[in-house]
Amino acid sequence: TTTAPSVYPLVPGCSDTSGSSVTLGCLVKGYFPEPVTVKWNYGALSSGVRTVSSVLQSGFYSLSSLVTVPSSTWPSQTVICNVAHPASKTELIKRIEPRIPKPSTPPGSSCPPGNILGGPSVFIFPPKPKDALMISLTPKVTCVVVDVSEDDPDVHVSWFVDNKEVHTAWTQPREAQYNSTFRVVSALPIQHQDWMRGKEFKCKVNNKALPAPIERTISKPKGRAQTPQVYTIPPPREQMSKKKVSLTCLVTNFFSEAISVEWERNGELEQDYKNTPPILDSDGTYFLYSKLTVDTDSWLQGEIFTCSVVHEALHNHHTQKNLSRSPELELNETCAEAQDGELDGLWTTITIFISLFLLSVCYSASVTLFKVKWIFSSVVQVKQTAIPDYRNMIGQGA
């Protein structure tokens, strides 16, 4: 029977956080069948990750994933464990937070005893880049509350813009989850200019299971915006024998990482594409790849596909690059095939020429040798005939 996993954060004790780095983890337990995938910060955190092989016990699988981060970045920066179980269509997110201490600490002890985990977790998400940059759309900042228990299901969410409370947010009814908890989503519509100018948005969550309200704050990342470079890459010739081909869009050299990449076909939005998360490059900018899968026939018929990019540093925040099977591409492929054929023919000609040349040399050498031998024999015979027999002549004179 298909069973969704439960996810538990693995948090170090206070004595394990004094070094230059700290190891955090996620325990994914009680799922069937395999596989599950575990990512950190939606794939943005990839270095220092170790995943322990899954173990089958009592008919269910378990595995753990660990990530090592600098102590200076946690808990000041968010670390999230993302778990996906395709078989049950389950996607879970777990924020790795410090342990919640009990009120009392023994005298002379630097660590509170009996640290416990519990209560809801709260995440805040920025508006989608396309929503924040296109005037025709409405950007929203979203607060997600997870692990709300059945015993204390009531959640109250308050919103603040630059520390001034606002009342324009809407909160959805709580949703039951696979692990017998609830999820609550609250969204705050915002003004484009407020986000672009760096205003600070905060959600404050109250719940009886929390010892104190949880606050999460977000604003537009600071830093000088850098314009992305967009390149489209046609499918390789080797794919043409298959039913589907892959079109690629490389977007590089951009900052900030907030970006939207979509595909269109003849002006209509496509769905069958996948984007990598923005990846931090060595120079501090970001890059990503986007892959669109299409029928080979559509590509061969010359349909026009468009990689559409939205980013704050672009003129009018938007750019497009078209990709289609062009006559030049066909000519290049034809020329390449012709060149391959010509090379094959050339090698055949060269082989025949070398063979004939060697045969000719052997024949000429044989004929020359025969002629030399014949001439030498003739010369010897002539010399023998021309030399007088002096002994006979002397005998006759006597």
UniProtKB/Swiss-Prot annotation:
InterPro entries: Ig-like_dom, Ig-like_dom_sf, Ig-like_fold, Ig/MHC_CS, Ig_C1-set, Immune_Resp_Modulators. Residues 114-223 are annotated as: CH2. Pfam families: C1-set (PF07654). Residues 224-327 are annotated as: CH3. Residues 98-113 are annotated as: Hinge. GO terms for molecular function: antigen binding; immunoglobulin receptor binding. One of its GO terms (cellular component) is immunoglobulin complex, circulating. Glycans are attached at residues 179, 322, 332. GO terms for biological process: antibacterial humoral response; complement activation, classical pathway. Coiled coil: none annotated. Residues 371-398 are cytoplasmic. Keywords: Cell membrane, Glycoprotein, Immunoglobulin domain, Membrane, Secreted, Transmembrane, Transmembrane helix. The chain crosses the membrane at residues 350-370. Residues 1-97 are annotated as: CH1. This is Ig gamma-3 chain C region.
